[in-house]
Amino acid sequence: MKTISFLVIVISAGILAGIVHGMLNIILVEPYLDNAIGIENQRLFAEGQAKDTPQFWQQFTDYRIWQKQGSIVAGAMLGASTGALFGLVFAYSRKSLPSDNDIKKALILASIMWAVLYFIPFLKYPANPPTVGEPDTIAFRASTYALFVALSGFGAVGFAFLYKKMKNRKFLVFVGYAGFMGIMFVIMPPNPDPIGTSMDLVNGFRIISAVTMTTYWIVNGVILGWMWKKVKPDAVPVA
């Protein structure tokens, strides 16, 4: 394995996919965030926690501009971290993945990691706009979500090793993983915060968030597969 070439392509693929994710968030997700934050601001005014003044709106506008500008950077950071993990798993499992085409191989793995690290946790703890959730529960919600992602990820790794060792009835591995995650769904606590805002806003935010994250994994898979095909970091040098 050519270490430098490997690191360059996996990090580059992740960052590029992350930038696409950040741009999509600005275009598609930010309007929902604006609506949700607008509702939250009105609640603050009604409860006397903030005053509807020009100074408030100036500070709010400056903060939102800073947030939106940071979406690209946040996307790139997400891409660099998850892209590195994706690249490591791809390098390890590439020969075991079906197809002779590196792009198809990468897309297959991307779909698996999307399901394990995003979609299955999303079913238990779907994304909510800022107007949903109390400040006091942020740490609890973040920790339970991270734990569920870890359980899903490590569970998938464990059952993947079983899949390689089993010669017959490999479908039982998928049944086992599904059963394991079903138990985790029951054991793990639910989201503690009730939804007190429009479900149209919440569902729209969840759908668009899922679209942007799904796009991220697809783009990461395509770019990594294409770069791997071109660079061939695992090629053995000819003496």
Model region roles, listed by residue range:
Residues 1-239:
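Juxtamembrane/disordered regions of integral membrane proteins
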